[in-house]
Amino acid sequence: YGECRNENVTLNNSFHGRTVTTLAATGQDVFHNYFFPFTEGFKYADADDMDALKAVVSDKTCAVMLELIQGEGGVNILDPEYVKELVKYCNDNDILVIVDEVQTGVGRTGKLLAHQNYGILPDLITVAKVLGCGLPIGVCMCGEKLKDVMSPSTHGTTFGANPVVCAGANYVLDTVANDEFLAEVEKKGQYFEDKLTKIDGIKSVRRMGL
């Protein structure tokens, strides 16, 4: 996306996967010790720090990718004001916003997708894991801005659109994508929070939904 843009920014303590490029995108040194060479072009900034983000953005920056809740990094929930400021900054500078919802998507946070809790609309969203309810599936969703960039057959996969897996995903969405189900997620999350905060030795509980 964009001419000569070959750099992307992710956040420290993020986790984006275990393939070579997603390991490069992951902002944790512990995951950078075993597989080489990594895909080049990734820079990292501290979460909830716009000055740190702006310091690593350049005219080569294509996208900023983030997890709204950093799971592997310690269940760090990004500050809503930071996220909104980040999205506005990226929109103003024609930088794509990618939200990795592999661990937070499909009802886990009390909304169908976690970014709905923040009132933002990313340019690209990745979803997997719970979407297949145990069956292997991954989805990359993009908006109008990328319709001419990610055209049919641009990306492919041996297992893509497996009919059994897609049928499973349809069932999951039919079950999860309704207000009553999602309200129960938040209700149960609040129940666990109330119980856990009463246990001696637990200093704090961080959650969004379940």
Cite the ranges covered by each PLM segment.
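Conserved N-terminal phosphate-binding loop of PLP-dependent enzymes in the Aspartate aminotransferase
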Residues: Y1-L210
